[in-house]
Amino acid sequence: MTSDFRMVFDARDELLASARECEAEVFLRAFGNTRAQLDEEYGPYEDSSVFLVLADQTDMVHAMVRLIAPGGPAGLKTLVDIGGAPWGVDGSRAASAVGIDMTSTWEVATLGVRRGSSAHGTRLSLALYHGLLTGARVNAASSFVAILDDRVRHLLGSVGILTRALPGTASAPYLGSGSSTPVYAHFAPLVENQRKNYPEAYRLVTLGIGLDGVAVPAPDEFKVRERVGQHLDSARDWSDLSVGRIPVA
């Protein structure tokens, strides 16, 4: 089967440049964030950033997720940012209160699909979610944190990617979004709940069954290349969950 798009985890070189262009286009349109503002916000996390992308046959990126891996010198942006306005919450204490292991918790920092990809928008969004969950499993992530625009949070919840607000936080304006919430989720119970209560989404988003037109790489290609000074724990796994091998669409 011919694929319109291919998925790449930890994009580099030309794909990385195209991913940044996609990120800038989406965030300017949705929230009014300029490229300079994005550079200022995410620059401290650059060495820890990992891009998951969906590219066409010309290597133009149509959809992307910027992840922040654990162990970087700047920490996780969500836990840093909730310490300031409008929340004023100690990120370390909030994380500790809900059992977040900082050595294996990742951040979903940005996520977007180009407007010109609207004909494939839903498919690309679902493929991004699949790549996110696959990358988390392969890299032994225990949890994730994010500050999600409430519309995006609702879309994730509709496919069983359910999140909770970090303690002491609530929906508030953030970086051009009129309503965003600092959230977290523990991956293993999230996937188990999805399997039980969102079985169709579990097959599509977690197992990747039915992602037609998107070439998904083998699981070992989701292994992130370790960054200097970071410890990515490969000892953990989700072996108690029937996630199975990820098929190629």
Feature map (PLM): residue ranges:
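Short amphipathic alpha-helix that is part of the acyltransferase structural core
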Residues: 1-40, 50-61
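A short helix-loop-beta-strand connector motif used in the catalytic cores of GNAT acetyltransferases and
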Residues: 44-53, 73-75
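C-terminal non-catalytic accessory extensions
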Residues: 238-249
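Acyl-donor binding region in acyl/amide transferases
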Residues: 80-189
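Beta-rich nucleic-acid/ligand-interaction surfaces
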Residues: 40-46, 151-155
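Short, solvent-exposed loop/turn elements at beta->coil junctions and helix N-caps
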Residues: 37-43, 168-173
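Accessory, usually C-terminal, subdomains that scaffold auxiliary metal cofactors
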Residues: 163-227
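Short, His- and charge-rich active-site/binding loops that engage polyanionic ligands
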Residues: 56-96
